[in-house]
């Protein structure tokens, strides 16, 4: 197809080129240009779709068939690769529409906040009579509320979700481990005081750990030593502990309560852990956990703070509070707009915490099934998770989600531009390889880097093609007494040559909306993507329309 003799099949005709040249020279203002630009059956020079690339690969086969994927393959997860503006989000929209219509719990993570995707998900959820949740960091006034650290299977998950957002390279790893222990002690103390973990509550407790510890000490004394107040009034701290309390800058009443508990021979790991924190000089200790405060400051500032640290007792706030268990029980559709263009760090922190929350819930579903804790049996549900630009959201939380959540019915589809983006974000080629090894289906649109293209081409076998070689020869006769003056001959030699089935160049020249796909165990397909048709009678609420404007 790409041989010079086939240029007439690939290149536009002279009449087509003349029409485009006329439009450029006349600025498209005369009546001829208005006719040549019309996309109609009677116009032989109608402009071609602005998809770019080299369409000849798709045109080799003139008979198109619909490509179907076995739904059983979905739990093997899928990756979609393609450079910017070649159709990733529209492909995401198409697959999401199918998942919603099929009845799957459908969750879409959209870091950049695509208005068309959000609108399409709302419309499809209404057509299917399904609940729709919209969480959007860029529009907190319209968004539902969600506490990323409020639900967990084990109390240690809270500290992990927060500490994982901190730097872990070099010496930062030691500080991150220290922050993890500090937050874990705070969280266990809050649980003992029946305080639900949230970013706001964690920040408040971290900034005033003396008060939190004092409240916990009092609760323990009330529970195990009723009437302790009289003994406490007559209790004097050992002189060494009193001097230490003054030196460290800690609250004297809290330090006295801790010393009083010690005198009562009340041993408990959490009390010892709080005592260890309080025994450190306040300013020195705050330096050790200094990396925690900027993160919490960002997560608890402005309108976003009320969004991700919801006050469950505020009855004046009409925005519903979302949690993943409620989403799955109601078979809902969820759009997550993380507004990463405004604040990438907050977007990553919330997105990663959501992935960790989903992974934790997957573990409970895997063990106990859906509807755990409810009367009656709940049917097993499929949960379709779509993560657009997932390289911005990737973290350690994502690896177990891909590794093990398939058994809980999770089927994940991720979208990114290059695989190097994933390696750069997660900071480890080995971990990036773990992620790639759990993505069994691959769809590759136009890409710009050879390394990304080779992720597909290296999985393909080489093929043999027939080659034809024309040989022509002529020569003088070697014997002078021969009656022949010269000899000549012509041959067509047919042979077989081994070549790659596809080269990286084929993938860097794809038109928009076209892709190669490896599905169902590495079967290769060349595909052209459909677009969902818009319904003119779609009713969109005013706030959705305002956000999409």
Annotate the PLM regions.
Residues 1-86, 90-95, 141-143, 396, ...:
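Basic- and hydrophobic-enriched, low-structure N-terminal and domain-boundary segments
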Residues 61-63, 69-86, 90-410, 505-526, ...:
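P-loop NTPase motor domains
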Residues 50-54, 78-81, 105-107, 304-309, ...:
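N-terminal start-of-chain detector that recognizes signal peptides
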Residues 31, 41-42, 68, 133, ...:
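A residue-identity detector for tryptophan
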Residues 152, 402-404, 408-520:
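Conserved ATP-driven motor cores of ASCE-family P-loop NTPases powering translocation/secretion/packaging/pilus
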Residues 2-31, 470, 500-533:
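Phosphate-binding and hydrolysis-coupling loops of NTP-dependent motor/remodeling domains
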């Amino acid at each position: 197809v790409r041989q010079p003799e086939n240029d007439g099949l690939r290149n536009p005709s002279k009449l087509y080129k003349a029409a485009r040249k006329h439009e450029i020279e006349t600025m498209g203002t005369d009546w001829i240009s208005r006719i040549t630009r019309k996309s109609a059956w009677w116009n032989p020079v109608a402009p071609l779709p602005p998809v770019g690339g080299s369409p000849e690969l798709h045109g080799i086969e003139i008979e198109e068939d619909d490509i179907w994927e076995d739904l059983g393959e979905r739990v093997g997860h899928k990756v979609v690769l393609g450079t910017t503006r070649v159709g990733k989000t529209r492909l995401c929209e198409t697959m999401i529409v199918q998942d919603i219509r099929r009845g799957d719990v459908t969750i879409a993570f959209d870091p950049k906040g695509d208005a068309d995707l959000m609108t399409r998900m709302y419309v499809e959820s209404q057509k299917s009579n399904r609940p729709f949740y919209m969480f959007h960091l860029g529009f907190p006034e319209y968004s539902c509320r969600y506490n990323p650290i409020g639900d967990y299977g084990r109390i240690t998950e809270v500290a992990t979700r927060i500490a994982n957002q901190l730097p872990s390279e070099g010496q930062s790893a030691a500080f991150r481990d220290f922050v993890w222990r500090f937050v874990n002690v705070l969280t266990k103390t809050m649980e003992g005081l029946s305080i639900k973990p949230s970013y706001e509550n964690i920040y408040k407790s971290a900034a005033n750990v003396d008060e939190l510890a004092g409240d916990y000490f009092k609760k323990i004394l009330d529970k195990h030593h009723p009437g302790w107040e009289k003994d406490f009034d007559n209790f004097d701290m050992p002189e060494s502990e009193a001097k230490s309390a003054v030196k460290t800058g800690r609250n004297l009443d809290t330090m006295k309560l801790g010393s009083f508990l010690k005198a009562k021979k009340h041993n408990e790991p959490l009390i010892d852990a709080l005592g260890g924190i309080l025994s450190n000089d306040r300013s020195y200790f705050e330096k050790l956990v200094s990396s925690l405060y900027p993160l919490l400051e960002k997560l608890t500032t402005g309108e976003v703070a009320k969004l991700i640290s919801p006050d469950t007792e505020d009855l004046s706030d009409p925005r519903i509070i979302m949690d993943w268990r409620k989403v799955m029980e109601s078979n809902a559709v969820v759009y997550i707009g993380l507004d990463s263009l405004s604040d990438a760090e907050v977007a990553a922190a919330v997105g990663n915490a959501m992935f960790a929350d989903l992974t934790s819930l997957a573990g409970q579903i895997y063990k106990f099934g859906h509807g755990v804790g409810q009367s009656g049996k709940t049917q097993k549900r499929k949960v379709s998770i779509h993560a657009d630009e997932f390289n911005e959201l990737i973290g350690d939380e994502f690896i177990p989600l891909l590794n093990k959540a398939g058994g809980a019915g999770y089927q994940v589809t991720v979208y990114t531009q290059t695989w190097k983006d994933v390696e750069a974000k997660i900071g480890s080629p080995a971990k990036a390889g773990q992620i790639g090894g759990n993505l069994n289906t691959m769809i590759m649109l136009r890409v710009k880097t050879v390394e990304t293209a080779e992720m597909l081409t290296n999985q393909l076998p080489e093929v043999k093609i027939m080659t034809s070689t024309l040989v022509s020869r002529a020569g003088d006769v070697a014997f002078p007494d021969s009656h022949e003056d010269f000899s000549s001959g012509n041959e067509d030699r047919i042979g077989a040559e081994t070549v790659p089935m596809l080269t990286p160049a084929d993938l860097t020249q794809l038109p928009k909306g076209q892709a190669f796909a490896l599905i169902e165990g590495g079967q290769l397909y060349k595909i052209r993507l459909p677009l969902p048709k818009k319904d003119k009678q779609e009713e969109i609420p005013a706030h959705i329309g305002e956000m999409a404007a």
